[in-house]
Amino acid sequence: MKKFWEVLDERLDLCREALMVRHNLLLGTPSDISPIHWQHGGIARLEKGEKIDSLLKDGYSTLSLGYVGIYEMTQAMLGVSHTTKEGEEFALQVMNHLKDACDSWKKETGLGFGLYGTPGESLTSRFCRIDKQKFGEIRNVTDRMYYTNSYHVHVTEEIDAFEKLKFESQFHDISLGGCISYVEVPDMSKNLPAVEQIINYIYHNIQYAEINTKPDVCFKCGYTGEIKLDDDMEWYCPNCGNKDKNEMQVMRRTCGYIGSNMWGKGRTQEISQRVLHL
């Protein structure tokens, strides 16, 4: 475990260096480069030719330290999920360590470093693929095609909506540069009081959360419901068997947004493994 903390601190130093490179590259940028943002009120109202430097300091802008795979990290180090007591303590310890690093950098530089729960898209599968090539297939770590976003409960874990929100809320208090939680639900059109109950719980107990459902449509047969995935990660209509992507609309939330585009293999596998929380 000692080696883990040593490597983590080495990587944090590298992250700080990378973020400072980004900050320094922006210094001296004239407002003319994007008038709608810097001159016309999108972000500020600077004069023509005025540099944006003042807006990069004193916490006005954010240098985000992102992270994915808290679940996989806990599995790799302890062999358990971070929803167990032992795993939860370790995950929170790591998260607080990341936050402390951001706070320290902020104090040293006066810049707005923040800890950000990353909604990785291609990154979620890329990192997993690279680690699998380097370290081999590790159970509950690299044996899938994706890493879990930020601090989220793994999509395959059986947990009800309220327990999931309660568990993840404690990470919201640490990941102040950005955080969000989700619950997966079936068609709730005939059970709106239950939706209201979830929303009420979110309002009173967690910083930011959203509800996911599956409002898919097959344009060939008119089926509405959940378009399924077969073993080859191909979408098909469970009513008529249609596999033509142009003849269906599959709606899922990825990276915080509900969209109907098709996704990479890693994200598609993650979507297929999501369990319902109600």
Q: Could you tell me what each predicted segment is?
A:
Residues M1-L278:
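Long, C-terminal-biased catalytic regions of enzyme "large/alpha" subunits
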